[in-house]
């Protein structure tokens, strides 16, 4: 199973949705970084369930425990183990799903591949696995902030066909956190919330798009060919549950332009830095960051587990009907915002360490 992510900043998540707990081991964190559970908890609180009526009603405090790798408030350079214990588990809600497959969920493919699966809340396929990613992302984020002043802000850009108008170059984190939708366009956020409320009452679900901007990105992150920065960013965010699409910069809209229209022309600013007049490249050229803002978008499908009756089959292949029980998000987007930020932070931190290891030696 692919439970480890990264090269120098390596992250291994563990645990199941309704098991004893979930967590992460971070290997490769530089020593002497000031780190406490408070640094991690503030990000976990943004991800936790039960925040509002738009999220799953499961009630978890998601209190984190640092088990190793930190001494007297600073990292040791040794593996950092972080644990979050599960408290509000109801495995009995999923008893029917031990035999019946949820449409568009991981149930059938897990059974086909492994011949066994944890059917209680989806086990490793549950979004609860992302607790470890968000915890590790908090550490990566702190490294990026201290080394380069890097700022990562994600927000809900679109819910179904309702799209927000947001300037990624100026959007503030406070505006994102100002409403339960995590959409900085307040008027559009109200429309999104109303739509999610309607879908929730129908025991249905809905998807959309999250946009993410990264500011103060060091020049030179990423490598040509197989380790291009945008390729690793795509892998990171596309590994999140329910993700179905990725684009960076102009993305698919760039296919409608000519080269003359699409190219980002260069100039030298007052500080002598090479800049681009536009940013259709999304901050990455040739697989390497150019110092401009990185702007990417991630598409998330509607939550697969819904309360409406659907046609499916059981493990024996017999056709049946399933109206799923359990507690689930009618829309994953508000809680996926910190997940996207975490994966972007993990990718950038790993590439930052790799860049320093390869390109910053003096001979």
UniProtKB/Swiss-Prot annotation:
Q: What does it catalyze?
A: 5-O-(1-carboxyvinyl)-3-phosphoshikimate = chorismate + phosphate
Pathway(s) annotated for this protein in UniProt? Metabolic intermediate biosynthesis; chorismate biosynthesis; chorismate from D-erythrose 4-phosphate and phosphoenolpyruvate: step 7/7
Provide the binding site for NADP(+): 47, 53
Q: Where does FMN bind?
A: 124-126, 286, 301-305, 327
Q: How is the cofactor bound?
A: Reduced FMN (FMNH(2)).
Coiled-coil segments, which residues? none
Q: What is its EC number?
A: 4.2.3.5
Drop me one GO molecular function for this one.
Answer: FMN binding
The protein's required cofactor(s) are namely: FMNH2
Sorted alphabetically, the Gene Ontology cellular component annotations on this record are: cytosol
The biological processes this protein is annotated with in GO are:
amino acid biosynthetic process; aromatic amino acid family biosynthetic process; chorismate biosynthetic process
**Record InterPro entries:** Chorismate_synth, Chorismate_synth_AroC_sf, Chorismate_synthase_CS
Which Pfam families does this entry report, sorted A to Z?
Chorismate_synt
Q: What CDD domains does UniProt report for this protein, alphabetically? A: Chorismate_synthase
This protein's UniProt keywords? Amino-acid biosynthesis, Aromatic amino acid biosynthesis, FAD, Flavoprotein, FMN, Lyase, NADP
Q: HAMAP family, per this entry?
A: Chorismate_synth
> What do we know about how this protein assembles, alone or with others?
Homotetramer.
| Family the UniProt entry places it in | Belongs to the chorismate synthase family.
The entry's function note states: This reaction introduces a second double bond into the aromatic ring system.
Recorded protein name is Chorismate synthase
Please report the organism this UniProt entry assigns to the protein: Thermosynechococcus vestitus (strain NIES-2133 / IAM M-273 / BP-1)
């Amino acid at each position: 199973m692919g439970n480890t992510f990264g090269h120098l900043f390596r992250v291994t998540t563990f645990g199941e949705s309704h098991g004893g707990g979930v967590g992460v081991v971070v290997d490769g964190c530089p020593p002497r970084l000031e780190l406490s559970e408070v640094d991690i908890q503030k990000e976990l609180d943004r991800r936790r369930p039960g925040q509002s009526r738009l999220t799953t009603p499961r009630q978890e405090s998601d209190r984190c425990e640092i088990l190793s790798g930190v001494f007297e408030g600073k990292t040791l350079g040794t593996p950092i183990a972080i644990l979050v214990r599960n408290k509000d588990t109801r495995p009995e809600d999923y008893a029917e799903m031990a035999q019946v497959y949820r449409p568009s969920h991981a149930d059938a493919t897990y059974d086909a591949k492994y011949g066994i699966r944890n059917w209680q809340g989806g086990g490793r396929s549950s979004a609860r696995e992302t607790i470890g990613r968000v915890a590790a992302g908090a550490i990566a984020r702190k490294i990026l902030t201290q080394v380069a002043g890097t700022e990562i802000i994600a927000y809900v850009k679109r819910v179904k066909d309702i799209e927000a108008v947001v300037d990624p170059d100026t959007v503030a984190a406070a505006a994102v956190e100002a409403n339960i939708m995590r959409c900085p366009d307040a008027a559009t956020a109200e429309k999104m919330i109303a739509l999610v409320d309607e879908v929730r009452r129908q025991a249905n679900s809905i998807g959309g798009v999250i946009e993410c901007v990264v500011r103060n990105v060091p020049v030179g992150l990423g490598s040509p060919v197989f380790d291009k920065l945008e390729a690793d960013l795509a892998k990171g965010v596309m590994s999140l549950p329910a993700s179905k699409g990725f684009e960076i910069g102009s993305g698919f809209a760039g296919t409608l332009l000519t080269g003359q229209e699409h190219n980002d022309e260069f100039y030298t600013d007052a500080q002598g830095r090479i800049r681009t007049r536009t940013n259709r490249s999304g901050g990455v050229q040739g697989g390497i960051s150019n110092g401009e803002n990185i702007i990417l978008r991630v598409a998330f499908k509607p939550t697969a587990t819904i309360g409406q009756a659907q046609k499916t089959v059981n493990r024996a292949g017999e056709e049946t009907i399933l109206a799923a029980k359990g507690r689930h998000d009618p829309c994953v987007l508000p809680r996926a915002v910190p997940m996207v930020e975490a994966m972007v932070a993990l990718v950038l931190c790993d590439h930052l360490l790799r860049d320093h290891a390869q390109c910053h030696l003096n001979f």
